């Protein structure tokens, strides 16, 4: 059993150490130009459709969560009377 574990460890280590690294293009300067551009558009919408959807989903969850928390606090503050 120990031999199997050691073999698995060696295979895993070899796989990790011999994989080629992917070189990604640095897009930071491009994004900086996009977001620093003065075009009158709010910064949370400059990223495109995905940013707009993410913003709306975040606002929906925030408002919904706040409303639910207030509702639960009200229900806890005014419990139903027992007969």
Swiss-Prot record:
Q: What's the chief localization of this chain?
A: mitochondrion
Q: Where is the transit peptide?
A: 1-23
Has keyword Nucleotide-binding?
Answer: no
Q: Which Pfam families match?
A: COX7a (PF02238)
GO biological process per UniProt:
mitochondrial electron transport, cytochrome c to oxygen; mitochondrial respirasome assembly
Q: Which residues does the entry place in the Mitochondrial matrix compartment?
A: 24-48
Positions modified as N6-acetyllysine?
A: 33
For this UniProt record, give its keywords in alphabetical order, as a comma-separated list. Acetylation, Membrane, Mitochondrion, Mitochondrion inner membrane, Oxidoreductase, Transit peptide, Transmembrane, Transmembrane helix
Q: Which ranges make up the Mitochondrial intermembrane topological domains here?
A: 78-83
Q: Which InterPro entries match?
A: COX7a, Cyt_c_oxidase_su7a_sf, Cytc_oxidase_su7a_met
Biological or metabolic pathway of the protein: Energy metabolism; oxidative phosphorylation
- Keyword Transmembrane present in the record's keywords: the answer is yes
Superkingdom is Eukaryota
- Cellular compartment(s): Mitochondrion inner membrane
**Purpose of the protein:** Component of the cytochrome c oxidase, the last enzyme in the mitochondrial electron transport chain which drives oxidative phosphorylation. The respiratory chain contains 3 multisubunit complexes succinate dehydrogenase (complex II, CII), ubiquinol-cytochrome c oxidoreductase (cytochrome b-c1 complex, complex III, CIII) and cytochrome c oxidase (complex IV, CIV), that cooperate to transfer electrons derived from NADH and succinate to molecular oxygen, creating an electrochemical gradient over the inner membrane that drives transmembrane transport and the ATP synthase.
Q: Which family does it belong to?
A: Belongs to the cytochrome c oxidase VIIa family.
Record text on subunit structure and interactions: Component of the cytochrome c oxidase (complex IV, CIV), a multisubunit enzyme composed of 14 subunits. The complex is composed of a catalytic core of 3 subunits MT-CO1, MT-CO2 and MT-CO3, encoded in the mitochondrial DNA, and 11 supernumerary subunits COX4I, COX5A, COX5B, COX6A, COX6B, COX6C, COX7A, COX7B, COX7C, COX8 and NDUFA4, which are encoded in the nuclear genome.
Q: What is this protein called?
A: Cytochrome c oxidase subunit 7A2, mitochondrial
Q: What is the originating organism of this protein?
A: Rattus norvegicus
């Amino acid at each position: 059993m120990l031999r199997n574990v050691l073999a698995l460890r060696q295979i895993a280590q070899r796989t990790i150490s011999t994989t080629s690294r992917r070189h990604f293009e640095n897009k930071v300067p491009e994004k900086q130009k996009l977001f620093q551009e003065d075009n009158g558009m709010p910064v949370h919408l400059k990223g495109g459709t995905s940013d707009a959807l993410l913003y709306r989903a975040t606002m929906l969850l925030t408002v919904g969560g706040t409303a639910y928390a207030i509702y639960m606090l009200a229900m806890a503050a005014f419990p139903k009377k027992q007969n």
